[in-house]
């Protein structure tokens, strides 16, 4: 859908959208079925652990500290959502006794996620993912990409599907 707002540059434009921006989405892909959203998934011998999510568009990695009692899908999802970082976490019930964690970033290539967990090898085994090599223990459901369009013969690329500055 193409629309204009008050103050838009007057003119006649030929617009061709070749690619819509997408937000990367990852899900847990553990060979072990996660049977409950309340079961502890972390190493019980570790008191604290830190989930680190690195994105090219973020100056510093997002660090989410979890205590021993915060390693269930419910608690991990809550902690990520409470960080209010542009990354959302949800839990999907695949079927009775089988749950997965899904993480979704904001639109655009700069928001691709690389995830690691420090201080808890069990959680790292569940959540680790490298977006540069597309390897790890999460599975990519949706690949991040920027919007690409052509306006009057000019190729334009933006991280979002809302383009407010071309033409001006």
Predicted ranges, named:
Residues 1-100, 104-168:
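Bacterial flagellar/type III secretion structural subunits and associated motility module proteins
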């Amino acid at each position: 859908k193409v629309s204009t707002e008050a103050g838009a540059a007057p003119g006649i434009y030929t617009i061709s959208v070749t690619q819509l921006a997408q937000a990367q989405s990852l899900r847990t892909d553990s060979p072990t079925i996660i049977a409950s959203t309340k079961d502890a998934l972390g190493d019980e011998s570790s008191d604290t652990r830190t989930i680190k999510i690195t994105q090219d568009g973020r100056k510093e990695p997002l660090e989410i500290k979890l205590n021993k009692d915060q390693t269930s899908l419910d608690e991990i999802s809550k902690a990520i959502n409470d960080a209010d970082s542009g990354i959302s976490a949800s839990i999907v019930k695949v079927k009775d006794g089988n749950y997965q964690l899904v993480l979704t970033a904001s639109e655009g290539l700069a928001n691709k996620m690389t995830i690691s967990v420090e201080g808890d090898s069990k959680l790292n085994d569940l959540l680790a993912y490298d977006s540069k090599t597309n390897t790890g223990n999460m599975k990519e459901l949706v690949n991040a990409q920027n919007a690409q369009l052509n306006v009057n013969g000019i190729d334009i690329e933006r991280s979002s599907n809302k383009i407010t500055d071309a033409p001006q």
